[in-house]
Amino acid sequence: MIGTPYTEGARRAMLLGCGELGKEVAIELQRLGVEVIGVDRYPNAPAMQIAHRSHVINMLDAKALRAIIELEKPHLVIPEIEAIATQTLVEMETEGLNVVPTARATQLTMDREGIRRLAAETLGLPTSPYFFCDTETEFNQAIGKIGVPCVVKPVMSSSGKGQSVIRDAAQSTKAWQYAQEGGRAGGGRVIVEGFIPFDYEITLLTISAVNGIHFCAPIGHRQEDGDYRESWQPQAMSADVLAKSQAIASKVVEALGGYGLFGVELFVKGSDVYFSEVSPRPHDTGLVTLISQDLSEFALHVRAILGLPIPNIHQHGPSASAVVLVEGKSKNIRYQGLADALAAENTQLRLFAKPEIDGRRRLGVALARDKDIESAVNKALDSASKVKVIF
């Protein structure tokens, strides 16, 4: 049962994290009559602008997080970022709090160690070789064992922060320092993993719903500096490799438990599929589903967490997304060129309405459909390039 917002019968959902992905989740929640409460570390975040009300707290502060949940008494708590005091969610779940998909899933995936150990050591899934390191000495020893090239990442980071590829041992000191600067909760533990010379990487959006496990068509993407630049759907792959990918994704999602959409990241080399990471929430590369599917990843996530069925997912054909990435400093961001950006057929645009920029930041995404993937990607890139950001 779903009541009406601002009434005693309202179904209340609290978003922990109010960025562009949270904003789309909030929109889908409101389409089904759910009262939305936004929480983030800074004011006027994108989802806060459309939430019924919002709060600014440090979500890594366990006392502050518990206090805001006890104040609002949400029926659903929806973590949208990693930098959260997840142990508080675990404790409150035992007291009756409904965390999406589960508090355990949120805690395991908040850092790379929990999910990597689950996938490789508990589930026995194929992954790259890896070591976790607390000190620079351990870090250098791990590089010696794995060899170069290898990849280093903070165990807790997002959007590529702190990630680098070491192609020569002489780069190790710089890579260690960069990883220490890039962690979401400050410096600390890192993962060093073998570099898989993959043919391509995919995000397999996997939904655990009341009527079973569902998959979106595979999404291909291009990364740069650890963050996605373009994504496209469907990624071409053989039926055998797709089946292997779906089997891996199913095992991970079922092990994490709960209802919701999961972004499962996989590497493909020949006929081999390797597990990389998973997010128990919509994925940035999945922004392409805003134009490629009848139900976007956000709509699917909301259906699942509300206990509603997903009878089918229709994919419209070759589609792509390209980010609007800007570097600068301003608290008065404005946009020009929108008419040019939207002049071509089957193009859309999402501007995230982020309140400020200080450095490099993703401010929007261009979306496109076309006759084939290459054409769709080029159309999305062309659209994104025509958006002019004024400071």
Curated annotation (Swiss-Prot):
Chain positions recorded as N(1)-(5-phospho-beta-D-ribosyl)glycinamide binding sites: E20, L21, E80, D284, K354, R361, R362
Gene: purT
UniProt-listed Enzyme Commission number(s): 6.3.1.21
GO molecular function: ATP binding; magnesium ion binding; phosphoribosylglycinamide formyltransferase 2 activity; phosphoribosylglycinamide formyltransferase activity
Similarity remark: Belongs to the PurK/PurT family.
Name of the molecule in the record: Formate-dependent phosphoribosylglycinamide formyltransferase
GO BP annotations, alphabetical order: 'de novo' IMP biosynthetic process
Enzyme class: ligase
Source organism superkingdom: Bacteria
Taxonomic path: Bacteria, Pseudomonadati, Pseudomonadota, Gammaproteobacteria, Alteromonadales
Function summary: Involved in the de novo purine biosynthesis. Catalyzes the transfer of formate to 5-phospho-ribosyl-glycinamide (GAR), producing 5-phospho-ribosyl-N-formylglycinamide (FGAR). Formate is provided by PurU via hydrolysis of 10-formyl-tetrahydrofolate.
Ligand binding (Mg(2+)): E265, E277
Catalytic reactions on record: N(1)-(5-phospho-beta-D-ribosyl)glycinamide + formate + ATP = N(2)-formyl-N(1)-(5-phospho-beta-D-ribosyl)glycinamide + ADP + phosphate + H(+)
Pathway terms, separated by semicolons: Purine metabolism; IMP biosynthesis via de novo pathway; N(2)-formyl-N(1)-(5-phospho-D-ribosyl)glycinamide from N(1)-(5-phospho-D-ribosyl)glycinamide (formate route): step 1/1
Annotated ATP-grasp domain residues: 117-306
Positions that bind ATP: R112, K153, S158, S159, G160, K161, G162, Q163, E193, G194, F195, I196, E201
SUPFAM superfamilies listed in its UniProt record: Glutathione synthetase ATP-binding domain-like (SSF56059), PreATP-grasp domain (SSF52440), Rudiment single hybrid motif (SSF51246)
Gene Ontology CC annotation, any one: cytosol
Record's keyword terms, sorted: ATP-binding, Ligase, Magnesium, Metal-binding, Nucleotide-binding, Purine biosynthesis
UniProt cross-references to PROSITE patterns, sorted A to Z: ATP_GRASP
Quaternary structure and interacting proteins, as annotated: Homodimer.
